[in-house]
């Protein structure tokens, strides 16, 4: 049987990377102009894949609007293939909802141009999450084409079935030699073309499961090769033993599907780095970018969209266009070169502007919600709406920032008086809040005493006692188990001779810790919260020496401030650490020696929980990159021996390390000065141009937030607390209160362990969309409860299109029975009346 050799013409377009956006955009305009010219005169130049992302169309047409019809014509013809993404994202550093919105937007734009390429194309993403098959199937994509994170060889073939934990499957096609395995085929004449095709095809045959070979004719920012059809015809006439032809990814996958029964099954994350680096240091490069991204995702997903739904159901217009504009700015920052922090300094400065735009739009939209609930009136009586973004009833802290704090008390929705604690410019209290709902509080002027008790060394509540040590670390006694965790929150600093892509220790790696510092401490105790304040300096080497093999002798003091907070009725210790970074070429982490011995860590992932073994990965000198013990996380990481456990939650700090002995390290900061370097200890080849990036040293003041959660049993006994820490109540300032607004309301309620990830208006109708997932391995039978009667409930896919004929007429009931299979992501479309 003949081999079919598919040559796929494409380009990989990094929107911004070693040059800023506008320069790469100028090149993009030239490239697409060239492409359209070739397609207009060369009928045999059949296909060109525009990198799986649609933002390039927007970028191009902003400069060349006159080319819109010609571009649309070539896309409709199937000669230019676009989508399914808006941008090619990093997967681990963005939320699951961000990935879904990315695909929704890519689908919308593609449909405007007449055609969507249904290929799960991720040519250069730095590893892949285990739930990607389920996400892709939610968009009717049954395949995945990728490069990094997998090593194809004689045993592990380049085509396989990739299965998510819920059972969703896609046909995965690995590109063993990259998305550039056949670039510049024609630039030196036919003889070189002939030699390259034969060499590359013969090499790939040893990895293939089917009789199909994929030659990717393109690379970063390359133009189409006009002579390609001519050379293909000459080659085919000369070598009839194989079939060489101009193809595309859709045609290639159609051929592979014919042999689907022969493909082996693989489950889990794709993070192998034997042949292709996954560049694991990107998890902590330019940490300020990660923190900004997380804040913007939380703003849109947890506050703006659900509160806009709430006001929409009360009669306000849903601001779809503005919400989508905010999402576009956010998604533009989630390219793998952007969110990873691996570009030149100019790029990341421009990213901060886009994050600012997201926050400006988000806060404006929340202000619009507040104005609507206030009836656009003001009065001396000040009302505050406090919203709970979690789908269960919480008891948690509420913070209200206010200028004038003299003689203030609160009245809750039932008329109960609350005397909050006052810390600096904040009112702080603890209260219960309804699921996906709110309470209205009223500010009242009343004489009150400001009582703030002090002692030197400890704070406690019903669950935990926290004692501060001389070095600023803490011991936590869990009153429920009687177990004490000692010396938690030790700072550990070491040299970093790497670059924006990889941590790499210098040959002589001086480690500095806070174990022996003498800290200044004091405590404050209120009715609802007690705090320990810690101050010390960390004496750190200024930078690496010129040989980059050791840290400098000269040292500078870097001030550290830590605030430990313990709230009444809440079994966790919230930590805010402020670090003034005055030095370069280093990595700063915090250590939590829990003493819990385990062979695995459980980690919050995308729409679920990832189980990772705690054993050193085996490797040898043939590996292109050394596997690192640092791994990605979303909201939390947990160690448990089955009887007790310790969870560490975080806000926008995606890198951790866990050991079998029970140590957890959380990376706070990684300071480097180069986009890429060669000859690293941890990576054999350079990952990009060797360019200095002084702003990646991250000098200045940094603020980190994380929470310590001792618990009984496994992660399921603590993850609600972690999510409450990350997704805290949102306070909206009202003037007067609109007459028909209830003072307390739960819009929807869904019992844990199910987790709601999205509450928004439908993309195509006036209905409401709610998305949730089952993070456990058991089937859950429960009910979704609604404050407003439901008329119809329909299960839809991630595109918000019906999965099957499953419309349920609710006859204005307020609850719907659900049976949710293990690890499933479920999206429901709800038809409901407006609130009168």
Locate predicted features:
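The substrate-binding groove and active-site-proximal loops of carbohydrate-active enzymes
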Residues: 11-28, 51-61, 84-100, 115-127, ...
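Catalytic grooves of carbohydrate-active enzymes
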Residues: 8, 12-18, 23, 170-374, ...
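Surface-exposed loop and adjacent secondary-structure segments within mature catalytic domains
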Residues: 69-79, 129-184
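N-terminal catalytic cores of secreted or lumenal carbohydrate-active enzymes
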Residues: 1-97, 101, 109-111, 138-141, ...
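C-terminal (or distal) subdomains of carbohydrate-active enzymes
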Residues: 132-135, 156-158, 174, 186, ...
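CE4/NodB-like, metal-dependent polysaccharide N-deacetylase domain
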Residues: 99-138, 196-214
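Alpha-helical scaffolding within the catalytic cores
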Residues: 33-34, 62-75, 101-102, 152-168, ...
